[in-house]
Amino acid sequence: MSNSKPLSLTDAVTTWYMKKLKSKPIQTKALTSATLSFISSVVAQKFIEKKKINWNAVVKFTVWGLISSPLVHYWHIILDRLFKNIKDKYQSWGKLIVDQLVFAPFINIAFYSVLAILDGKPKSILFKLYFDLFPTLKASWKVWPLAQLINFRFVPSHLRVLFGNLVGFCWGIYLSILATKKRN
């Protein structure tokens, strides 16, 4: 008979998730991101905008979550390699600067491009970027630098995408509202 007590539901789910993260990191991160994107879109529409759920928008935002997570996964690998020989105290700041000046514009361009394609309006990409990219970046720079500094400084590398997903849940609500307003 074992002296260990049975795992709580939280412990069991955490253990299962960590195993999946190790055995299938990209799929696990993509499905996590898609799930949180789905939930954030529903929350934004139903509880913040207080309107009937536009399931078409929810599906598009969920697809975005599925696509974006692998990009973020590989971005973190690139950052880790770029800054591997830098002292710890400078590493986080270096990653933050490169992340916000290179990846933030890239991921937001990708966001608007993917949504335009999913809307069946690929010709509107440049128009959307012209009007929406800088306001979105300005808004993101109010949230993501602090979140990413915490992420780069304190979160183990295998959990950084998950941490970003959790911050992104709130950010996703904002983006979902923004994307829905821009489409209407």
Swiss-Prot record:
An example Gene Ontology CC term for this record: cytoplasm
Membrane topology type: Multi-pass membrane protein
Domain of life of the organism encoding this protein: Eukaryota
Membrane-crossing residue ranges in chain numbering: 58-78, 97-117, 159-179
Signal peptide: 1-44
This protein's UniProt keywords: Membrane, Signal, Transmembrane, Transmembrane helix
Pfam annotation, one family: Mpv17_PMP22
Cellular localization per UniProt: Membrane
Stated family: Belongs to the peroxisomal membrane protein PXMP2/4 family.
UniProt-listed PANTHER family: PEROXISOMAL MEMBRANE PROTEIN 2, PXMP2 MPV17 (PTHR11266), PXMP2_4 FAMILY PROTEIN 3 (PTHR11266:SF112)
Protein known as: PXMP2/4 family protein 3
Source species of the chain: Dictyostelium discoideum (Social amoeba)
